């Protein structure tokens, strides 16, 4: 099974829990794809079943804060298409759960179905 885990990559609790969950699932043989803006701090060792997909946000001078949500949902769509993801685990409601929903709707229009859990 191919699982995408979308999380914050910082020291905070949700990022730690999501990373530890991903590592445990990878050790059981699942293919884990972390989608985040940086390497999770608790992801310190290489594992053949763990893949990191970094979200890059382009600088655009019109915006005070760059549109991370759009870049994140686009990266989710890309990863689901390329790696045949079965489940997106969106480990935080805002912005991860609603960007996962946006990605799911884009993929549905292409005939691809992916489950989301939060």
Question: For each predicted feature, which ranges?
Answer:
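An amphipathic, basic-hydrophobic alpha-helix
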Residues: 62-87, 97-102
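A structural micro-motif
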Residues: 1, 30, 50, 114-115
